[in-house]
Amino acid sequence: MRLRNRSRGGSHSRLLRPVAGVSVAAVVALVAAGCGSSSPSSGSTSSGSNTIPKGLSISSFTVNLESTMSKLKPLAQFATKGANSLQVGVILPDTTSSVRWVDFDQPYLNDAFADAGYTQAQYRIDNAQGSDATELNDATADINLGAKILIMCPLDGPTGVAIAKLAESKGVTMISYDRATFQGSKTYYVSFDNELVGKLIGQGFEACVQAWGIKSPQVYVLNGGEDTDPNAISFAEGYNKVVWGQEAKSVNAGATNSAGMKLVGENFAPGWDNTKGGTIFQQAFTANPKINATIEANDGLSNAVITDLKGDGVKPNKIPTTGQDATAQGMAWILEGYQCGSVYKAVYKEAQDAVAMATILLAGDKPPAALLNGTTTDPADSSITEPASLLTPVWVTKANMESTVVKDGFDTATDICTIAGASVCAAAGIQ
């Protein structure tokens, strides 16, 4: 069984470097005229079959990547036509908003491509390092090198739109990975059901408040990067609907619910910046020390909040926090009684889904309905939708940690227990 093999080939060095101080709009104007054709090179030979594996669906992807990805080899061979050149470019957003991009997405994507039969020359994976100019440069480089498909997680809306426009102008199909880009007629979306992610956070929060015996919950909400990421809005709509009965990205302070909870305040962490998020919460907690329950949009923000709470002497099982991404630190906080749970988005599924979609589209085929199973809607304009492949997330607590993230190898017991301590893990049955 192949898991997160970081030494495996397929990660290529960036061919275009960021342009300091250049705006997305300026870079688009600069590169548009010079972008080369994405048509396949002449003289290539094809092999394989253009048949999509029977029964391929969002349920096909297991932690044993090879079991499903290897079935795509004939289709990948047909799609790439034997070319010894770039066919699919992948761009991840940064290394700071979440550990997932480096620790999970990149190695799983590498494995998925390799198991599907792609050579190292036929795909490359870059990371924009948090720079919109770098992300656009990487996309431009991929197109110039002949990529027919771009798998891209946009840093923000304007960057995603700029890349989608550039891709469409060159006949390149784009797959928005994890974060949607509502632009272009050749754009698809691969992710988890974002509103469901939010609902799981809300449901987990409510269960935790009850289990921890929080009296008259005075709730503070720390949302994700709503200024840059439409997913953050969907997450908020999900947990706000569950907790406050309002499917909205923002709820006014003073809102209450039938469980006796009261919203004392909310804010968002710009650009998913955990440090800024921690500062925002610290200021709110200082101004309103009666806060005794919190909702956070991911584990990075929860970690920042918990660090502040511990610094103020708060003991376990006193102030609930929430998260997503199922980080090892998040799992440790759950075991220690500082975090209620975390939404586990099995990245190995998302990586396989993206590679399967890319292979099908590269072959000129239409993804089956069991794979392209829904649509995503622009939070800013409900009339704008995008075809989507939506995976199902899981809420992880102390009770199911062993059977989910540990069993899958997403977080190892060693990683979790190094943080939480052997005695804490032993008490929870994590070994």
List each model region and its residues:
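A residue-level marker of the well-folded mature domains of exported/periplasmic proteins
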Residues: R2-R14, C35-Q431
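Sec-dependent signal peptide hydrophobic core
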Residues: L16-V27
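C-terminal motif of bacterial Sec signal peptides marking the signal peptidase cleavage site
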Residues: L30-G34
